[in-house]
Amino acid sequence: MKSSNIGGQAVMEGIMMRHGDVYSVAVRKPDKEIEIKVEDYKSIIKSKKILSLPVIRGVFNFIDSLVVGTKCLMYSATFFEEEEDYLRRKNLQGAEKAKEDAKKEKEDKVLMTLTVCFSVAFSVALFMVLPYLIASLLHQIGATETIVTIAEAGVRILLFLLYMFLISKMEDIQRVFMYHGAEHKCINCVEHGLPLTVENVMKSSRFHKRCGTSFLFFVIIVSIIFFIGFFAVVPVQTMWMRVAIRILLVPTIAGVSYEFIRLAGNSDNPAVAFLSKPGLALQKLTTKEPTEDMTEVAIAAVEAVFDWKEYLRENFPETEIPEEP
């Protein structure tokens, strides 16, 4: 199976899809129409050659994904703001509209920056720092640093699974996870040589090896390996230094995890497939079976940035491409 190199994420009542330097956002509006927005986004990686090196590129790809993802979430949310605000902005015209749009764009940039910074800080605190602080309580009963690090690994996995389980039970998030499933189904559909139709998408798998859920799982696993290995070789006596080192290792951990996900998405190797299974299993929590109207939104997002017919002609020449209606 050849990767299509498309990826995306679910947003509020919609899907973001990205291919190369272009991304689209398709949203099912309250009036049931599908709104599609297409924009260019030049990756940070392409600004300097060194940023495209293995591991390093993973760090900056993660930053890119956070920025684009947050921007698209904020855009999708505008369709579901208070009706009074929505109608007021919709009825603005001329200079007044331009002024309001400029003001909103500035506010959105500030909010996006704060959201990305908070998301990173929250994730590092919850999944990197807190597990160690909890496990370090074992020092009080005479546990060695090696035992504490191993216990930290168990706490980290439990916290991650608990977090995933709890958010999967939230009603609003469940709809997002249904759109997440629709996103995966679209990608699986074309990557398995099927024309991108509602019928074909609905019968495709909602699990995909390049998923962000799998990436997060590998961040957890790689962090465990790094921390156990590092502190076994380099004894660190003070707690604040041990916490600081964990934080400093996060970019490297993210970069290594990205390389594995990249490999998994482009390989049918049995060993890689086996290592991908835990991440795929976690997607049972973070993806749900979508409805047909959600699938229509996902297809619209894909078609806005990706020529799936040309992809099928090149990689699956035996596939019969449906003619334009």
Spans of model-derived segments:
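Pore-lining and gate-forming transmembrane alpha-helices of multi-pass membrane transport proteins
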Residues: 115-120, 148, 152, 156, ...
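Polar-ligand-bearing catalytic/cofactor-coordination segments
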Residues: 2-7, 11, 15-17, 90-91, ...
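Juxtamembrane "helix exit" motif at the C-terminal ends of alpha-helical transmembrane segments
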Residues: 75, 79, 120-144, 219-245, ...
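Hydrophobic alpha-helical membrane-embedded segments
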Residues: 53-75, 79, 151-177, 250-266
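Alpha-helical transmembrane segments of integral membrane proteins, especially early/N-terminal helices
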Residues: 17-23, 115-124, 175-177, 215
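Divalent-cation
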Residues: 1-93
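Cytosolic juxtamembrane amphipathic/interface segments immediately preceding
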Residues: 1, 5, 10-11, 46-52, ...
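Hydrophobic alpha-helical segments characteristic of transmembrane helices
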Residues: 86-140, 144-169
